């Protein structure tokens, strides 16, 4: 399912994407008989390397025909570029970081990709593993059906209502008219709640402003919520998006000349959402804030006729979140894998095998 061509061009443009203020990248194509048969990016994110104190080199945007020689040539080209820059491994796919689309889909190919989510041919796994790429980390996406509402909502409501009065928590929608400030508040929670996560890198102020501009056309206030105390202290946030891929599937990647008409008609019939993030600041964890945010998502889905919710990716090592998804009657429906190939003798594998949820 093609993404919007205009959005992909902006994302890859070194002059327009603020990611390149702290990173560099090179793009490679594989050709056979004058025809392109594959592509890959190689990139170095200095902000990631500084924050995580590592020397990771990254690859992304991997697409390839079912041809091991083409896949090998692409990975070797990316690896050579990274070795020249002193990286100790090639790790990915990340398009460009864990703040963007990441991982190779290895389970769940029968499901349509949701907004801001990659989809890959099943044979890509054998292409990468055939070139000596090993698992670094798995990411899970969970499915929760609205029809389970009557079974789960009483549990959430009990937790939320019992604890909210004690801590003076109130919920309000993110304000689209003040989106830049709302995105900064969102990232305040994000940076605190996710900072210890594997592969995490904080966004710069310029990246936050860029994100606000990208979100504004697609943000739906019904699915974006801020939790704060009565004195305005930020406690938590949740951000979900209607699955606009149900719209984009009919546009073949282009809004012009007439795709926007189809978009307007189709968006009213969107039946799924993707939870991009739901997080609580450390001092408000275990206070019912998360339960209140979960309840808000369920209530919004019920009002809008949303039948299916899919989470953003959750690290296989995040046991508390994976257990929470099970408690909400969720089931893991997609698995993404981040691979690595070590390049330096002193490089330590990032792989941690937990067995998954």
Predicted segments with their positions:
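A conserved beta-strand-loop-helix scaffold within acyl/acetyltransferase catalytic domains
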Residues: 1-33, 40-51, 173-280
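Alpha-helical subdomain
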Residues: 44-47, 249-250, 264, 269, ...
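Flexible loop/turn segments at secondary-structure boundaries
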Residues: 46-49, 98-100, 149, 209-210, ...
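Acyl-donor binding region in acyl/amide transferases
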Residues: 50-132, 251-328
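Short beta-strand segments
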Residues: 91, 143, 226, 239, ...
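Acyltransferase donor/substrate-recognition loop-hinge adjacent to the catalytic core
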Residues: 118-199
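C-terminal "cap" of GNAT-fold acetyltransferases
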Residues: 142-159, 337-357
